[in-house]
Design a protein with these regions (language model features):
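Iron-associated oxidoreductase/ferritin-like identity signal
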Residues: 1-188
Length: 188
């Protein structure tokens, strides 16, 4: 006689349960029942990321305007392009804060105290490139840590940060290449 198997419980939630949960917790917006992270902590972390991106936009913009010299035109264009891309990151992060139920903090008086990177100064061209390279390296390390932190608890935020990280790594490489071009040797 064949042994009867117990019915296998599916790992997916049935559609009726999903619908009922969505209706019951409608006030949660994009933060659903299955969100495993600490929403308040996620928002606080993202506020610091937002501040970092704003400071980067401001620094790159200032450098794009302030860069001078016979060989500055290409560098100015690179700074301006990076400022535009950082502004895109800023908008992504602000939108994610909003999705999690927070209000993005654009308060200019607290930006530098909340940001991982520094604003910098308008020195000579090589100094500007170095400041941006340092800021990008800080962002890369910081975002890698945050990606590990969010992991499976908040895949939406993790995925957003992974996309931003790829661009920040490209920015760091661009700044390194500019530094090599203007100093004549790699900084290894």
């Amino acid at each position: 006689m064949a042994k009867q198997k117990k019915p296998v419980k599916p790992f997916l939630t049935d559609v009726k349960t999903l619908r009922d949960r969505a209706r019951k917790h409608i006030a949660g917006g994009g933060v659903t029942f299955t969100y495993k992270g600490d929403v308040k902590k996620a928002i606080d972390i993202l506020q610091a990321v937002l501040a970092t991106e704003i400071v980067c936009v401001l620094r790159y913009t200032m450098h794009a305007v302030a860069a001078q010299g016979i060989s500055s035109e290409g560098v100015k264009a690179e700074f301006a392009q990076h400022a535009k891309e950082e502004q895109g990151h800023m908008n992504e992060v602000a939108e994610r804060i909003n999705q999690l139920g927070g209000v993005p903090d654009f308060n200019p008086t607290t930006l530098t105290s909340r940001a991982a990177s520094e604003y910098g100064t308008a020195g000579n061209l090589v100094e500007m490139i170095k400041e941006n390279l340092i800021a990008e390296r800080i962002a890369v390390d910081h975002y890698r840590e945050l990606i590990r932190y969010f992991g499976d608890k908040d895949p939406g935020t993790r995925t957003m940060l992974e996309g931003i990280l790829v661009v920040e790594e490209e920015h760091a490489n661009d700044m390194h290449d500019l530094l090599v071009a203007h100093q004549g040797h790699p900084m290894l």
